From Swiss-Prot:
SUPFAM superfamilies: Scorpion toxin-like. Beta toxins bind voltage-independently at site-4 of sodium channels (Nav) and shift the voltage of activation toward more negative potentials thereby affecting sodium channel activation and promoting spontaneous and repetitive firing. Its main location: secreted. Residues 1-55 form the LCN-type CS-alpha/beta domain. This is Beta-toxin Cn7. It is found in: Secreted. Keywords: Disulfide bond, Ion channel impairing toxin, Neurotoxin, Secreted, Toxin, Voltage-gated sodium channel impairing toxin. SMART domains: Knot1. GO terms for biological process: defense response. Belongs to the long (3 C-C) scorpion toxin superfamily. Sodium channel inhibitor family. Beta subfamily. Has the structural arrangement of an alpha-helix connected to antiparallel beta-sheets by disulfide bonds (CS-alpha/beta). It comes from Centruroides noxius (Mexican scorpion). GO terms for molecular function: sodium channel inhibitor activity; toxin activity.
Length: 55
């Protein structure tokens, strides 16, 4: 499963400005989803990969 990560407080996606491989997105995805997650910047928001099915 894949998808954007959102802020639980306001429901907004995590913004990013460097498209493609992005250390910020990778770090945020791993923090919120787990060590096996991947992440990159897609359409100026952080996109996470390898999410659990219940995410």
């Amino acid at each position: 499963k894949e998808g954007y990560i959102v802020n639980y407080h306001d429901g907004c996606k995590y913004e990013c400005y460097k498209l493609g491989d992005n250390d910020y997105c990778l770090r945020e995805c791993k923090l919120r989803v787990g060590k096996g997650a991947g992440g990159y910047c897609y359409a100026f928001a952080c996109w996470c990969t390898h999410l659990y099915e219940q995410a």
